[in-house]
UniProtKB/Swiss-Prot annotation:
Family annotation (PROSITE patterns): RIBOSOMAL_L36
GO cellular component: ribonucleoprotein complex; ribosome
Superkingdom assignment: Bacteria
HAMAP family in the cross-refs: Ribosomal_bL36
Protein's organism: Serratia proteamaculans (strain 568)
GO molecular function: structural constituent of ribosome
Protein name, entry field: Large ribosomal subunit protein bL36
NCBIfam families documented for this protein: PRK00831.1, rpmJ_bact
Amino acid sequence: MQVLSSLRSAKNRHPDCKVVRRKGRIYVICKTNPRFKAVQGRKKKR
């Protein structure tokens, strides 16, 4: 899963990609091609 600052290009990668909001984060999920998964707003690990 990619951590992106902007999901603008991620949601247009595949026709089946959907934008979902869960727990204050925004996810792009794609069931037909899971390599297009992405998330915006994740905390960085230090």
